[in-house]
Structures are given as structure tokens and as C-alpha cells.
Swiss-Prot record:
Amino-acid positions noted as binding 2-oxoglutarate in the UniProt annotation, renumbered to this chain: 292
Protein's UniProt keywords contain Phosphoprotein: no
PROSITE patterns: FE2OG_OXY
Organism placement in taxonomy: Eukaryota, Metazoa, Chordata, Craniata, Vertebrata
Record protein name field: 2-oxoglutarate and iron-dependent oxygenase domain-containing protein 2
Domain Fe2OG dioxygenase intervals: 207-301
One Pfam family of this chain: OGFOD2-like
Native organism: Danio rerio (Zebrafish)
Length: 345
């Protein structure tokens, strides 16, 4: 497998302060005070003790990121040793898991006459710009997968936080889903669609991913603040269980301020996936009852992100890592990132 890298901004940028619904950049305390102290005061962080508490949370998050590679590897090893799956079959993708309409679209995309206009006749277009809906899995598979995820959640095996904003969920590569499930799903069934729908933003050359499930519950995470993804294209599939409300809402692309954006709500439907551009700003409204599990696949195109990191908006400075990491690669001429450093652990 080709070597993948992380951008060094992972250790400084897009740190989410849940209490203030704010993403920040932290290089030093002096820089942070200069850039954010007045903003935080306007959001209710008025005292020095409150500010010091914010600094402490940021430093803890940076430490978590610095140790992420090591801790993830350790968790995966322990899970492999001590965890016994409930449904072993869900770890290996089979066409019988997939909805007929997805298989029909993939078949169409493989035909010589395939084009965007033809695919748009087979896929549902949402009111939000270039957001598409289609049934991904059969209900029986979603039921089995949810039972497996809940079985793992209730086990003594270690669990990692799925991302910097969700507190509850599962990182799927640590559980062993990447090679036999997520990778073939991306390569064989999703990339034919994204190649037509998102060719302008890397959809035709997706070569890595990060996949995780997130959980929303009345006693845990209820919603998700407005954000963009570390992906070129994202698939968000509602797996279940029983829930009310909690719709997604989409704004504009990340370059457009929220004040200039009109948001559009998009409903979650079990077994169905929503496909959208990673830089398309979005969030999740609060559920009002029940529990909802979502499968999220951040699909990445090194050819696209090697030019500009989607998280910091600059040419990436690479940090060595494991697996698919954040989807950056070294160009064949070595030019993509002359600055390559070892991960801080």
C-alpha cells in the first residue's frame, strides 16, 4: 500500500471548544490570546480562570492528537486479542448486504453510455446543493451491523473517540472493518458514483478514507455543531435505531460565512446514505427521542489534497503516520511535501 501522511496542522488547527461552539487554532498561548480572547469573552468566557480552563482543554486535545497514532495501534491490538465478534459476517462486504438501487447505479456507471445526467435519473437529489440520497444497505444488514456495534460497545475492549467533535462512537479500522469492508465499498461501489458526481473535487480519484460510526442518544451526544469534514467526499448512512428529529442541515461551502448562508434541512432515513462534498458546511440538529447510529465515511483523494490541505487551506506539511492517515501522499517527484517530519508521540 502507498504511504499516506498527515498534515502538521492536525496538531494545531481545528480544535473544537464544545462549550463555546468554536473551532480554534493554537500554536502558543500568546498567539491564542491575541486571536481568540476577545471572541471568547463575547461568548461568555469572561474571567481569567475560565480562559485558563479553555487553555487546559486545548492542551489536553493536542496531547490526545500527538498520541493518537500510538494509542490507536495499541487499541487495535488489544481489540484483536480480547474481543469476540457477535456477527463475524458483517466484517466482510457482500453484495447481498447492499440495496438493489445502489447495485443498479453501479452497473449503470460501468456502462459505456454512463454520464452525470443519466446517473441523476437514478439517484435522489436533495434541496441542498449537490447533496444526493440513495439506499445503501438492506434493512437486515443494518440490523446485524447495529447488533455487532452495540455488542462491541458493551464489551471491555478499549474504544477510541471517533473524531474531534463526537464523543460517542467507534473508529472502524480499530475494530477491523477497513480491509474487508470499507475499502471494497469505497473502491467498487462508491467511487463509480463519485467519479461522475464530484469529478471536480477528487471524486474520480478517491484513494483512501477514514470510517467511523457516531452515536446520538438522549443521555449522550444530542447534536453536532456546524462544521466541514476532512474529506473530499463524505457518505453518511443512517443505520438506526428508533429516533425522532435530528435532521442534518447544510449551509454553503466553507468559504461562505454562516451569516450569508441559508441552511437547508435534510432528513435521516434508516438504510439510506447522504453523499456530499467534504467542504460543504453542515451540522446535525438534536434528536428528541431514541438513539441514532450513523456510519460516516470520509473519502479522500491524495491528488486533490496534496495541492491544498482541506483543513488549514495551505500546502500540506507532511507528518509520517500509519495506515491511510489523513490521505496525503508523497508525489512521485518528491515535491508534494519537501517538509516531512516524524509524528510527535
Amino acid at each position: 500500500m502507498e504511504r499516506f501522511y498527515t498534515c502538521s496542522c492536525f496538531f494545531t488547527d481545528n480544535i473544537f471548544l464544545e462549550e463555546y461552539k468554536l473551532h480554534v487554532r493554537f500554536v502558543s498561548e500568546n498567539q491564542f490570546r491575541k486571536d481568540y480572547q476577545n471572541i471568547l469573552r463575547s461568548l461568555g468566557c469572561e474571567s481569567e480562570s475560565q480562559f485558563r480552563d479553555v487553555i487546559g482543554k486545548i492542551q489536553a486535545e493536542i496531547e490526545r492528537r500527538q498520541n493518537h497514532k500510538l494509542k490507536s495501534t495499541e487499541r487495535a491490538a488489544v481489540i484483536k486479542e480480547i474481543y469476540t465478534p457477535l456477527h463475524q459476517h458483517v466484517y466482510h462486504l457482500q453484495e447481498s448486504f447492499l440495496a438493489p438501487e445502489l447495485l443498479e447505479m453501479v452497473k449503470y456507471c460501468a456502462s459505456s453510455e454512463a454520464n452525470v445526467q443519466g446517473l441523476l435519473k437514478l439517484i435522489q437529489t436533495e434541496a441542498a446543493s449537490r447533496v444526493f440520497r440513495f439506499q445503501v444497505f438492506r434493512k437486515e444488514f443494518c440490523k446485524d451491523l447495529l447488533e455487532e456495534l452495540e455488542h462491541f460497545e458493551q464489551s471491555d475492549a478499549p474504544k477510541g473517540r471517533p473524531n474531534t467533535m463526537n464523543n460517542y462512537g467507534i473508529v472502524l479500522n480499530e475494530l477491523g472493518f477497513d480491509e474487508g469492508f470499507i475499502t471494497p465499498l469505497r473502491e467498487v461501489y462508491l467511487r463509480p458514483l463519485t467519479a461522475l458526481l464530484y469529478s471536480d473535487c477528487g471524486g474520480n480519484c478517491l484513494d483512501s478514507h477514514k470510517a467511523f460510526v457516531v452515536k446520538y442518544d438522549m443521555h449522550e451526544d444530542l447534536n453536532l455543531s456546524y462544521h466541514y469534514d476532512n474529506s473530499e467526499v463524505t457518505l453518511n448512512v443512517s443505520l438506526g435505531k428508533d429516533f425522532t428529529e435530528g435532521n442534518l442541515f447544510f449551509g454553503d461551502m466553507r468559504q461562505v460565512p454562516l451569516s450569508e448562508t441559508e441552511c437547508v434541512e435534510v432528513e435521516h432515513r434508516v438504510t439510506e446514505g447522504l453523499l456530499h462534498r467534504g467542504q460543504h458546511m453542515h451540522g446535525a440538529l438534536s434528536i428528541s427521542s431514541g438513539t441514532r447510529w450513523n456510519l460516516i465515511i470520509w473519502m479522500r483523494a491524495s491528488r486533490q489534497r496534496n495541492k491544498l490541505c482541506p483543513m488549514c487551506g495551505k500546502r500540506p506539511t507532511l507528518v509520517e503516520s500509519d495506515g491511510f492517515s489523513d490521505g496525503f501522499t508523497m508525489d512521485s517527484d518528491g515535491d508534494a511535501r519537501a517538509n516531512v517530519s516524524c509524528s510527535l508521540t
